[in-house]
Regions:
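Short Gly/Thr/Asp-enriched flexible loops that form oxyanion-binding sites at enzyme active sites
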Residues: 35-54, 80-82
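Buried hydrophobic positions in well-ordered alpha/beta secondary-structure cores of metabolic enzymes
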Residues: 12-16, 28, 33, 57, ...
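Self-splicing inteins and homing endonuclease
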Residues: 26-27, 32-44, 106-115, 212
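Short glycine/threonine-rich catalytic loop with a Thr-x-Gly-x-Asp
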Residues: 6, 30-32, 46-51, 127-134
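N-terminal small/polar loop signature for handling phosphorylated ligands or for N-terminal nucleophile
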Residues: 1-39
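Short, acidic/small-residue loops that bind anionic groups at enzyme active sites
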Residues: 45-66, 96-97
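Catalytic-loop motifs flanking and including active-site residues across diverse enzymes
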Residues: 11, 49-56, 133-137, 141
Length: 214
């Protein structure tokens, strides 16, 4: 038993087993109301939804150049460095995590699509009507597979290697969380100002639209 949640590792493991047992090309997992979609590749490996969003954005950009995409701040930084999106003059805006925040920003910016790491994907015209739709998300994945004529494992392996963890939500009292974030922002700003390297990299940008990202 598991929670019908595209971020739930037990659910993804069950879909992975089904993909391998049936020699399937792809596996999809939807939440209870069908507005989120998780993806398992042909080898039974789970793909975090932000990277699926990146692959969909790349595929859409070939037909919809000069488009905007909205992603939440938990999403991969590959959106900012992707050569396909750059070649098609597409812009990515990192925004607040949360269904309502991303949906509103997609419509405000008249973006083609919005992607949240939780699996909420939003599509504007001509792809959708601005709301999150798990079935539409799965269809867009099928489109990119068809257009590239490759296995999903091949497509995902062509992306630069990055390291991610599942979404974590450690407890923090509501009265304390804003102070914790403020203290963390100050610390990160000090590290940036001192040009202290983390994993041999200097901090280039600090994004505080929702917590802190660097």
């Amino acid at each position: 038993k598991y929670n019908p949640n595209p971020e739930d590792m037990k659910m993804l493991k069950a879909i992975s087993d089904a993909v391998k047992n049936n020699n399937a090309d792809i596996g999809f997992g939807f939440d209870g109301d069908g507005d989120r979609c998780g993806v398992i590749d042909n080898e039974g490996k789970e793909i975090f939804s932000d990277k699926i969003g990146l692959l969909i954005a790349r595929n859409l950009s070939t037909k919809h150049a000069n488009s905007k995409f909205i992603v939440d701040v938990k999403s991969t930084g590959l959106f900012n460095t992707d050569n396909v999106l750059a070649e098609n003059n597409c812009k990515t805006i990192y925004w607040k995590t949360g269904h309502s925040h991303i949906k509103r920003k997609v419509n405000l910016e008249k973006a083609l699509a919005g992607f949240e790491k939780s699996g909420h994907f939003f599509f504007n015209q001509p792809l959708g009507y601005g709301y999150d739709d798990g079935i539409n998300s799965a269809i867009q994945v099928c489109h990119l597979l068809n257009n590239q004529n490759k296995k999903m494992s091949e497509i995902i392996n062509e992306l630069p290697k990055t390291f991610q963890s599942p979404t974590m939500a450690p407890y923090c009292d509501d009265k304390e969380k804003y102070r914790v974030v403020e203290d963390l922002v100050k610390k990160i700003e000090e590290i940036k100002a001192q040009k202290t390297k983390i994993d041999n990299q200097e901090i280039k940008e600090i994004l505080t639209v929702n917590g802190v990202r660097f």
